[in-house]
């Protein structure tokens, strides 16, 4: 995994809770930088898999912990207060060979739900992306947290997110249908419009148009089929084309295998590599799997993304801003989480 030299930090505020940034004895609001708590520390321990920070001070120990109810602070005197609260489900993943990694990756997903909206990274992306949102939906379904984004999905009013330079990306249609299906919005008015739009944009049953500035008919059409299937709608008219598509290795959800899908690791966009390794039959290299046995924080990331607003990181993570790097990142976290749970169970 790509690492950028930054001072240790941790994020609190999974799901609908206020987002809080911890570093070096200070806990601040991510929305305006205002101080929530601050103390001079003699030392600190960040226990990322336990969603816990322990601060050693001259007067004793301060603990901040996040659980299924909220974020709680206990000061040196033992006084306890809840800083922000709303329910989330936090499986322990006990017995899983990558238990600690799954705990952190799940945190990476939940921390990036802001105002009920699933975003790739809440610092540098202010709008949800349907692709990342659909991948997050898969994780939320596994962990019983779909309710966190149900209202956002119900309020959707556009067939495309138009986040990539305003382009109406064809894979969005299937991702939208999938999100609506899984969040229980099965009578949403966008569903018939999306089906009609997909037929309009199809040639011989395969979607046309762009995704990430290129044509990817196999990838786009497979997303469409998955979304329709999730809703129980007719897919007989959908025909996945037998043509080369560099994004075909990213779609493992239909169970197909491409033996040589995984090549070299992509440090800037690691979600591509984890998806391809999944499609290739769980072939992620030993180096990157070994890094998850004793994971640091954060695990997931993205670098040099064309639409990310990296300067928004500067008040909190200046080294990340300089490197045009954001972490955690939900598409990456979702691909890793789904790889590990599909391989070993949950």
Positions of PLM-derived features:
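Low-complexity, Ser/Thr/Pro/Gly-enriched N-terminal "stalk/linker" regions
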Residues: 1-128
